């Protein structure tokens, strides 16, 4: 539900994070937070056990379809931001399935990276927590160098310590899929910031 609301919010020009915060003030409402998809060894798989012996499970399948579509939704945002840029490079920060864990099983970051590569983007990855990921994990400086867009996929607390003014990127763009970073700090460092689910975004890519 939260991820579908995020997509609706972007189309309607509203901030889904504000809308969810207001809705959750009602004592009988508890909408979760949107994001780039759902991973791990439980949530993406276990609900499907309920569908094995029943045909009346439309909501379960629909929920999975929406969550599975979120990496593609992030790709659409990147297309708009980096349109026309030659040989674009993305830096993915966070590849484990959730913040402050090393587990990368069923992580939506993997699907996102594969989609990005299929679209012709160069992709570099950085994650100080993850282990056993299929793509090489670089140190922060190397992952950021000459990149055109940072894509935060996992909300590791250590990422709050990034100093965006020190990043040696070719173009300064940030997509925050978790509404996690200090966006004013990034904007003050010259970054064009897009937050998943924030329909107020009207920025354009900063391209050299």
Regions found by a protein language model. Give the residues of each.
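Structural/interface elements that position substrates and couple domains in central-metabolism enzymes
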Residues: 1-208
């Amino acid at each position: 539900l939260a991820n579908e609301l995020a997509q609706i919010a972007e189309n309607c020009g509203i901030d889904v994070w504000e809308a969810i915060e207001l809705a959750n003030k009602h004592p009988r409402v508890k909408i979760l937070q949107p994001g780039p998809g759902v991973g791990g060894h439980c949530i993406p798989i276990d609900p499907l056990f309920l569908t094995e012996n029943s045909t009346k499970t439309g909501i379960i399948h629909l929920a999975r379809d929406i969550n599975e579509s979120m990496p593609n939704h992030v790709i659409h945002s990147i297309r708009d931001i980096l349109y026309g840029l030659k040989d674009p490079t993305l830096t993915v920060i966070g590849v484990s399935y959730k913040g402050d864990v090393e587990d990368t099983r069923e992580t939506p970051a993997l699907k996102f990276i594969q989609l990005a590569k299929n679209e012709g983007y160069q992709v570099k990855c950085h994650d100080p927590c993850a282990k056993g990921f299929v793509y090489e994990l670089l140190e922060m400086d190397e992952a950021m160098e000459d990149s055109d867009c940072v894509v935060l996929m996992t909300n590791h607390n250590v990422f709050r310590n990034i100093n965006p003014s020190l990043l040696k990127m070719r173009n300064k763009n940030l997509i925050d899929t978790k509404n996690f970073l200090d966006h004013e700090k990034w904007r003050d460092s010259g970054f064009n910031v897009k937050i998943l689910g924030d329909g107020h975004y009207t920025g354009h890519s900063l391209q050299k």
